[in-house]
Regions:
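Active-site-proximal beta-strand elements of phosphoester/diester hydrolases
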Residues: 2-5, 20-23, 104-110, 127-133, ...
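Binuclear metal-ion centers of metallo-dependent hydrolases, dominated by the metallo-beta-lactamase
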Residues: 4-9, 81-102, 181-242
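Pre-active-site segment of Zn-dependent metallo-hydrolases
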Residues: 10-47, 51, 58-63, 134-163
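Active-site beta-strand termini and strand-to-loop segments that position acidic
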Residues: 13-16, 101, 120-124
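Active-site neighborhood of phospho(di)ester-bond hydrolases with catalytic His/Asp-centered motifs
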Residues: 21-25, 42-56, 70-75, 129-133, ...
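Active-site environment of divalent metal-dependent phosphoester hydrolases
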Residues: 27-29, 51-56, 76-81, 97-99, ...
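Active-site HxH/HxHxD metal-binding segment of metal-dependent hydrolases
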Residues: 34-98
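Active-site-proximal loop/helix segments of hydrolase catalytic cores
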Residues: 112-190
Length: 242
């Protein structure tokens, strides 16, 4: 499985002839453009987990000719930006809904922010999970009441991911939260059966190195991309660079 980092929470995943693009709001390295022009895919699916500007952008409209399906969170349906997209190619998904065609199957899970998380099962049987903005958003300078609400909201939703399988999981490890940046990721890998974790939502912060607390829960390969255009291949056991 080939993985390219776009920016923020944006990634492109290719498995055999299936191309998945997640939360592509900017692509400074031109990764998706290059793949689109090369055309080495049979199916192209573009996902947006929610309507925040750093997850959903109209620039992915330019791929419409070859797109198999745009798969958007249902909150995007109510934005002005989505009106430029061909409605015949859009599927909107609410939390805990499913969608499939003859190539992939998609599950949508709830978030602790707006929108949804996606899990995609590919023809090869491999599974990809993208959390969107689902996380334990613990801000040290917030009020005790809000900190408590954030914890309860996360734990209520993460319980529903217990036993969920994914070969690759994209999950926020947001450097703005300092010592609390791993809280969500630790609880997530403790419950879900994931083979690796890719850190996201950390623009402007250095490479994340898993703490002992994280590794004590699940010793899995991790990747914390730093620069747009970085690439890794995941073989089910480890990441490898070009």
């Amino acid at each position: 499985m080939d993985i390219n980092y776009l920016l923020n929470s944006g990634f492109m995943v290719q498995d055999e002839k299936i191309l998945l693009v997640f939360d592509d709001y900017e692509d400074p390295a031109g990764i998706v453009d290059a793949a689109y022009d090369k055309g080495d895919f049979d199916r192209l699916y573009i996902f947006a987990t929610h309507a925040h500007f750093d997850h959903f952008s109209t620039h992915v409209r330019s791929y419409a000719q070859k797109v198999t399906r745009y798969i958007f969170s249902s909150d995007i349906k109510h934005t002005k930006r989505v009106k430029v997209f061909p409605t015949s190619k859009i599927t909107y998904m609410k939390r805990y809904s499913e969608w499939e065609d003859d190539a992939i199957k998609v599950w949508a899970y709830d978030s602790t922010d707006v929108g949804v998380c996606f899990r995609v099962e590919l023809p090869s049987g491999k599974k990809v999970f993208h959390a969107g903005d689902f996380n334990w958003w613990h801000w040290e300078d917030d009020t005790p009441e809000n900190i408590d609400l954030a914890e309860k909201a996360f734990k209520r939703q993460v319980k529903r991911l217990k036993g969920m399988e994914a070969d690759v999981a994209f999950f926020p490890v947001d450097g703005r939260m300092g010592d609390s940046q791993e809280k969500g990721a630790i609880d997530f890998v403790a419950r879900a059966e994931v083979k690796c974790l890719v850190a996201m939502h950390r623009v402007g912060y250095p490479i994340w190195t898993p703490s002992r607390d994280f590794l004590a829960i699940r010793r899995i390969p991790t990747w914390s991309p730093l620069k747009p255009g970085e690439h890794r291949t995941f073989d089910g056991v480890k990441f490898s660079e070009d």
